[in-house]
Regions:
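The alpha-helix within a helix-turn-helix
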Residues: 4, 15, 140
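Conserved tyrosine-mediated DNA breakage-rejoining catalytic core shared by Y-recombinases
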Residues: 16-77
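Short pre-functional
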Residues: 1-12, 28-29, 127-128
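Short, basic (Lys/Arg/His-rich) helix/loop patches that form interaction surfaces
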Residues: 7, 65, 80-94, 101-141, ...
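Short, well-structured alpha-helical segments
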Residues: 1-5, 118, 152
């Protein structure tokens, strides 16, 4: 969850992330795959769904995201062998998106925080980046969007503080 809050990556991208996708020396994370649960095509199969790892849905979603030093400091102690999933833990088993979403909801309930879905971390990241002064093109590329319109329409939410700050930029006309 920490990585999502500071990178804006999607839940499927987080679950598909392996340690070989994180360069601790270059302070970067490379998004090359996503994980999702799909309905089985065989209606008689014992398993009604299956988990797959594929390339992201668009070319723009294949990206390298620079990581701030403090993020590297937090994740470095957990680094493991290159082909190990970042979320695999001691059991070396994958953590798929549905499990991650359930954990997120449990953490919210435990903290008595109003219900939200995991994707809200991505929205929070985008809004915080705009508040911090990121330009929209850079943010759009970090989020893996094919156009800045997607970023502006769906992910950037202005706050009253930001609105006030922008309004303070206006100066009285000189006469």
């Amino acid at each position: 969850m920490f990585l999502c809050l500071y990178t804006g990556i999607r839940i499927g991208e987080l679950c598909a992330l392996q340690w070989k996708n994180i360069s601790l020396s270059e302070n970067a994370i490379k998004i090359e795959h996503t994980m999702q649960r799909l309905q089985s095509e065989d209606t008689k199969a014992l398993q009604k769904t299956r988990i797959i790892v594929t390339e992201p849905k668009s070319y723009a979603a294949l990206r390298t995201i620079p990581l701030p030093e403090f993020v590297i400091d937090v994740i470095k102690p957990f680094a493991s062998s290159p082909n190990t999933y970042v979320l695999s833990g001691k059991c070396k088993k994958i953590v798929e998106p549905r499990i991650m979403q359930n954990r997120f909801k449990a953490y919210l309930a435990e903290g008595k925080i109003e219900e939200a879905n995991f994707h809200s971390l991505r929205h929070t990241f985008a809004t915080r980046c705009i508040e911090a002064g990121f330009d929209v093109k850079t943010l759009s590329e970090i989020l893996g969007h094919s156009s800045v319109k997607i970023t502006l329409d769906k992910y950037v939410h202005s706050s009253m503080k930001l609105k006030r700050s922008n309004m303070e930029k206006l100066k009285p006309a000189s006469v």
